[in-house]
Amino acid sequence: MDKPRVRFAPSPTGYLHIGGARTALFNWLWARRNGGTFVLRIEDTDRERSTQLAVDAILDGLRWLGLDWDEGPGVGGPHPPYFQTERLDLYKAHAERLIREGKAYACYCTREELDAQRKQAEAEKRQFRYPGTCRDKPYDPSRPHVVRFRVPDAGATSWNDLVKGVISTPHDTLQDEVILRGDGVPLYNFGAVVDDITMEINLVGRGDDHVNNTARQILMYEALGYPVPTFAHFPMILGADKARLSKRHGATSVTAYRDMGFLPEAVVNYLVRLGWSHGDQELFTLDELVRYFDLKDVGATAGVFNPEKMAWVNHEWLKRRSPEELAKLALPHFRAAGLPAEDDEKLRHVCAVARERAKTLGEYVQQFRYFYAPIALDPKAKAKFLTADTRPVLQAVRDAIAALPALETQAVEQVFHGEAERRGVGLGKVAQPVRVALTGGTASPGMYDVVQILGKDETLKRLDEALRIAGEPG
């Protein structure tokens, strides 16, 4: 069996979305497991919507996920170029060959004529199919025309899909579709076939929204006289409402999840499990995925995208990182929020306490910004815990911390425990007013960690402000 040559062929009309990323991942894993080749091709024939910004975003997204390509933009390869707009002569040559052999023909029908036929079909409540008006007309390259592929009148085209099994499409459900526009730009099916032939792709793995294209493409392979590749159509990714995943379900681009503070290994881990499994194992390194992944284990049932489960997976991966690693990862997120964080012991301590609480690096910033910015006092917490009744506790803790030569853990703990014992109350009666004073809210890491992270000067400053508030008339 030949080593697999697979491809990922995105259209640069937007960011790398979740569905596309999973398609790339499945192809990449299959190539890596079998010593094959992963080709990246950019299908940029939609000139109005394709942008260099989108190309860059797709490449950046793949690199961030760790999906390197063996041939394609930036790395070259034996079958250049890797942008469809640079391959127009190739499509023209293949189309003209099909015309010469009677397997395609020039269609001279005007847009107005075709629109009139469509309207008539609508009025008669039937589906419009091109009637083959120009099938037998002589080829006149001097006349404006498109090129149509000649579909056999009878029979059916079948293939054994690696994921979906045997699929058959009757030819009478197909029409003579346009394969080359008048400006020389190929339509999707023809461009993909010519590219896959010339790039020697022998396995086409893609989303199952392309199933309906497959019979048409197989007919084109056969007409051109080339071997038909193996096809694998991966199940759709749906939102919680079982509709196709879209922006209304929340973030759908890889870039968005990177910016929210997801780790690439977590995104890869979650995406691969949307359609593939290996026993009960939930978490996989990329090396493990290369070792275990098999297309025969990809299910045919659509996967439901669950942001909460994805966040859980990310949290598990964050917990595997050391505070030192987390600090380097979290620093750009703190700085992007305008917070004066540094890669220092303070940030490492913040990450150590955040690791068990926050599921994304973005949540590190959201939940613990009070370590780097003035607190935003929760009105309910302020009304309940910064009062004349709690002022003595706040004062006692403030004075005890001021007297400490250093904020060693045991000494800080003793401040809180000692005050609770002196007052004959539970630890919460002491800690909670101080927590509100130092963080602005009623939920935080342990007060010993909070005091140590803030440092003595900032802790005393915030306690002094809390004492001022607690002394105000209610």
Swiss-Prot record:
Q: Recorded E.C. number(s)? A: 6.1.1.17
Query: Where is the motif 'KMSKS' region annotated in this sequence?
Result: 244-248
Keyword terms, alphabetized: Aminoacyl-tRNA synthetase, ATP-binding, Cytoplasm, Ligase, Metal-binding, Nucleotide-binding, Protein biosynthesis, Zinc
- Classify the main location: cytoplasm
The record's subcellular location field reads: Cytoplasm
Catalytic activity annotation: tRNA(Glu) + L-glutamate + ATP = L-glutamyl-tRNA(Glu) + AMP + diphosphate
A single GO CC term for this protein reads: cytosol
Report quaternary structure and partners.
Answer: Monomer.
Name of the protein in its database record:
Glutamate--tRNA ligase
